[in-house]
Curated annotation (Swiss-Prot):
NCBIfam families: asp_carb_tr, PRK00856.1. It comes from Bacteroides fragilis (strain ATCC 25285 / DSM 2151 / CCUG 4856 / JCM 11019 / LMG 10263 / NCTC 9343 / Onslow / VPI 2553 / EN-2). Keywords: Pyrimidine biosynthesis, Transferase. It holds the Pfam family OTCace_N. This is Aspartate carbamoyltransferase catalytic subunit. It is an enzyme of class 2 (transferase).
Amino acid sequence: MENRSLVTIAEHSREKILYMLEMAKQFEKNPNRRLLEGKVVATLFFEPSTRTRLSFETAANRLGARVIGFSDPKATSSSKGETLKDTIMMVSNYADVIVMRHYLEGAARYASEVAPVPIVNAGDGANQHPSQTMLDLYSIYKTQGTLENLNIYLVGDLKYGRTVHSLLMAMRHFNPTFHFIAPEELKMPEEYKIYCKEHNIKYVEHTDFNEEVIKDADILYMTRVQRERFTDLMEYERVKNVYILKAKMLENTRSNLRILHPLPRVNEIAYDVDDSPKAYYFQQAQNGLYARQAILCDVLGITLQDIL
């Protein structure tokens, strides 16, 4: 049987991405469709989450599915030493699809290989976050009217930021120019720069973050420095406040510029930016509902024709 899991966005073709965005668009028109009546969605969060977990659960509820799962692994048998394989096999007895976030890179891939039901990767360590990428792509498409030939500036934690890794891979189909803005300690890992070269993705690296650097951006994708990924807290203290976006920095930017952030923010976007028409991060989070409805339907075999 075909495995319909969503482990990485790299497995999606250009056509598949555009198809998924069209599904999300239909759900934005009407999110209350009982397409998953009688289905059970399990949300297994081995790492903290607010937006991802709640938007997946809301997506499932609005589609008529029931939701089971946990948001704190300490309250489960994994705290007693149960293996990931056993947890996945056990939950597969109860659910039609498993949405999983895990602190280990590769955990979602492993789960998809042992589970008899589809796995949706809701983040695996610093590796991938494909459902976030789907809502990011939808947000970019909605605000720019296209995914083609855009200048996309990725700012902050590019080393541990799984959202920027996934976005980079997804955009390979659309001829972007990336600008990687990060301190030395958090720059884009070599493997992703090699990926860019292999797929003819243009990129420029910066360590400065100022008005001049960002003036040609179509998308400014801010990220927080992730304290939980650091083994050396002194290193975290050195870089945590390195880039802060302030409203005055936007004065000479393009009129079509939109600021995205996977959230939560800490202090990398000043609150005075919230009032700018270029700030889009809260609407971006709302788009997560529609993108995740599309993902749940797709992995469960529901097509665009079923919802038109």
